[in-house]
UniProtKB/Swiss-Prot annotation:
Function, in words: Site-specific tyrosine recombinase, which acts by catalyzing the cutting and rejoining of the recombining DNA molecules. The XerC-XerD complex is essential to convert dimers of the bacterial chromosome into monomers to permit their segregation at cell division. It also contributes to the segregational stability of plasmids.
Keyword Cell division among UniProt keywords: yes
An example Gene Ontology molecular-function term: DNA binding
Localization (cell): Cytoplasm
Gene (UniProt): xerC
Location of the active site: R150, K174, H242, R245, H268, Y277 (o-(3'-phospho-dna)-tyrosine intermediate)
Upper classification of the organism: Bacteria, Pseudomonadati, Pseudomonadota, Gammaproteobacteria, Alteromonadales
Occurrences of domain Core-binding (CB) (ranges): 6-90
Name recorded for this polypeptide: Tyrosine recombinase XerC
Similarity comment text for this entry: Belongs to the 'phage' integrase family. XerC subfamily.
Stored CDD domains: INT_XerDC_C
Principal localisation: cytoplasm
InterPro entries according to UniProt: CB, DNA_brk_join_enz, Integrase-like_cat_sf, Integrase_catalytic, Integrase_recombinase_N, Integrase_SAM-like_N, Recomb_XerC, Tyrosine_recombinase_XerC/XerD
Organism: Shewanella sp. (strain W3-18-1)
Length: 302
């Protein structure tokens, strides 16, 4: 047990008996708790022991383990051992307050979904066909990637949402916050092709994307169509709306150093947890978009 004092060693032995007899924990759990206590004791400052450790010391220990790459599960186990130790010392009258009470382990950030590279997206968007379903689906996928829309945002678009002459789409995002997002030339062309078919579908709904019977497309239907085209184009990844949105963000950030512009294009309050949300004028957003997005450039005459 390293450089522990005799009192610490005695307390740990009593703690082990307490876990077995009174808490009736399994031998495996008891072993894990003792292992964790021995580990964290080596991370405490030299003048701090398991008997006089404070809340700030436990916070520092957890932060160190987090930085070392300990998994959330391992951090949770360590925290449980620390809390049980505090409860034991409290029960024995050796401390007045459990310093670990209320502590929570640092959470590791969830990995972002893998984006599709430009070549894969280009291949996906090269679908051909003149039937209404193909034209509609191509327009949806182009718009997802062109403007980084959320699934709910695209599904809620109406015929009046797109300003074709200005190459803009008016989007109602989370919290009913409206924003204007540029639309690339490829997406505009695909939308115009779909619009010809859309106008021939009897429909009382003003939705931009509808079924053959004139009903607004559901979220599930849009997801299903994206997955279908990913399979038909023989892509190695499953295609879904958020993957296109994430690819939009990734490719924009790779081409542009303007994090705040991309943040606003996405409609995020925070793209980075440390980045304070700032509002940019639309002219600047359009300029960044036009110079950075792979499919925003005007098509050259062939």
């Amino acid at each position: 047990m390293g450089d522990m004092s005799d009192l610490e060693v005695t307390c740990l032995q009593d703690y082990e008996r307490y876990l077995h007899s009174e808490r009736q924990l399994s031998a495996h759990t008891v072993h894990n708790y003792l292992y964790e206590l021995n580990r964290v004791s080596t991370l405490l400052p030299k003048d701090v022991t398991l008997l006089n450790v404070g809340r700030e010391h436990w916070q520092q220990v957890l932060a160190k383990l987090h930085r070392k790459g300990l998994s959330p599960r391992s951090l949770s186990l360590c925290l449980s051992a620390i809390k049980q130790w505090g409860e034991f010392l409290l029960r024995e009258g050796m401390i007045a307050v459990n310093p670990a009470k209320g502590l929570s382990a640092p959470k590791q950030a969830k990995p972002l979904p893998k984006n599709m590279d430009v070549d894969s997206l280009t291949h996906l968007l090269e679908i051909e066909g003149t039937d209404p379903l193909t034209l509609r689906d191509k327009a949806m996928m182009e718009l997802f990637y062109s403007s980084g829309l959320r699934l709910a945002e695209l599904a809620a678009l109406n015929l009046s949402s797109v300003q074709y002459d200005l190459r803009e789409v008016r989007v109602l995002g989370k919290g009913n916050k409206e924003r204007i997002v540029p639309v690339g030339s490829y997406a505009i062309k695909a939308l115009e092709a779909w619009l010809v078919c859309r106008q021939q579908i009897p429909c009382e709904d003003c939705a931009l994307f509808v079924t053959g019977k004139g009903r607004r497309l559901s979220h599930r239907s849009i997801q299903s169509r994206m997955a279908k085209w990913g399979q038909e184009q023989a892509l190695s990844v499953r295609v879904h709306p958020h993957k296109l949105r994430h690819s939009f963000a990734t490719h924009m950030l790779e081409s542009s150093a303007d994090l705040r512009a991309v943040q606003e294009l996405l409609g995020h309050a925070n793209l980075s947890t440390t980045q304070i949300y700032t509002s940019l004028d639309f002219q600047h957003l359009a300029k960044v978009y036009d110079s950075a997005h792979p499919r925003a450039k005007k098509q050259q005459d062939k």
